Design a protein with these regions (language model features):
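Short proline/glycine- and acidic-rich turn/helix-capping motifs at secondary-structure junctions
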Residues: 8-22, 113-129, 158-162
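Short, intrinsically disordered/low-complexity patches at protein termini
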Residues: 31, 102-104, 116, 138, ...
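C-terminal substrate-recognition/cap domain of FAD-linked oxidoreductases
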Residues: 1-98, 105, 109
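Short amphipathic alpha-helical interaction segments
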Residues: 90-94, 98, 119, 127-130, ...
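Activity-critical C-terminal alpha-helical subdomain
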Residues: 124-165
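A structural signal for short, well-ordered beta-strand segments
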Residues: 40, 78-82, 117, 123, ...
Length: 165
């Protein structure tokens, strides 16, 4: 129904373990392909997975960098990887615009900017794409209610402007 090209289900314990071994090593194998990699997890409705994969494929074709994705089809979680073959300034400068294009597309498809790893330092700059300023301000007020001294994960979720006077 979602145009899968291959599906494998196993009941043999040895074959199940082999599939898990492949799954556990995908990230390491992809990381070994490049000198520098940024991996972002996002989530989209399951019906939008094919469109997400097609978009990532198009990004890959349009860039000198390598871009790929894999994920957990059951919950729509997709890991998007942008990889530079060197640390040349022109390659490094291309990473951020590609990631922002991907984040905007994920939101356009009805997805969310984080699938399983949270916002943290890496994605807080994108929060304004998903949430408007009043929503972010409300979230910041909730945080300050429970953490008025900013002791828990300081600076890791919200843009600093939400706490300036």
């Amino acid at each position: 129904r979602n145009h899968a090209t291959y599906l494998r289900q196993e009941s043999d314990p040895e074959k199940v373990e082999l599939l898990w071994k492949v799954r556990r090593n995908v990230s390491k194998a992809v990381k070994a392909l490049a000198k520098y990699r940024v991996s972002e997890d996002v989530a989209v409705p399951n019906s939008k997975i094919p469109e997400t994969v097609a978009f990532v494929s198009e990004l890959n074709r349009s860039s000198r960098l390598r871009i790929n994705c894999w994920g957990h089809a059951g919950d729509g979680n997709i890991h998007i990887n942008v990889m530079a073959m060197s640390d040349a300034p022109e390659e490094m400068a291309e990473i951020e615009p590609l990631l922002e294009r991907a984040m905007r597309k994920i939101l356009e498809l009805g997805g969310t900017l984080t699938g399983e790893h949270g916002i943290g330092l890496a994605k807080k700059r994108y929060l304004g794409l998903e949430f408007d300023r009043p929503t972010l301000a409300a979230m910041a007020r909730i945080k300050t209610t429970f953490d008025p001294d900013f002791r828990f994960n300081p600076g890791k979720l919200f843009p600093d402007y939400l706490f300036s006077t």
